[in-house]
A protein has these predicted regions:
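An acidic/histidine-cluster motif and surrounding catalytic segment
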Residues: 1-105, 109
């Protein structure tokens, strides 16, 4: 693992179809000076049907707009809908392959 005891815990942020909540969460993270030294992984699940498509697209566009504001940001757009539990489980496992610790957030926290 590349992590060590002196690095900040990376953040795994899970999003789906709530762009307003996601914006609030991202803005809150940016208020913390430590975010410049923190890895931010954002996992976006794919929409299930056309009812969620527009909101999911807004989430993707918002993340693209915010990507330049974070120094260490990786956005993972799922190619198929995994569902909340699988998206979170797989995302956490992916982060733990690179780091020894993690902070988990959802877009509405």
């Amino acid at each position: 693992m590349e992590g060590n005891k002196h690095e900040y815990a990376p953040i795994a942020l899970f999003a789906f179809k709530r762009p307003k909540h996601l914006k609030i969460t991202l803005d809150s993270l940016l208020l913390n000076p430590e975010i410049k030294k923190t890895f931010l992984y954002v996992f976006v699940d794919k929409f299930l049907d056309n009812n969620d498509k527009e909101a999911n697209l807004k989430v993707k566009n918002l993340l693209k707009d915010y990507s330049y504001k974070f120094q260490n940001m990786e956005i993972i757009f799922n190619k198929k809908n995994k569902g909340l539990a699988n998206n979170i489980t797989e995302g956490i496992k992916a982060v733990f392959k690179k780091h020894e610790k993690i902070i988990v957030l959802e877009d509405d926290i």
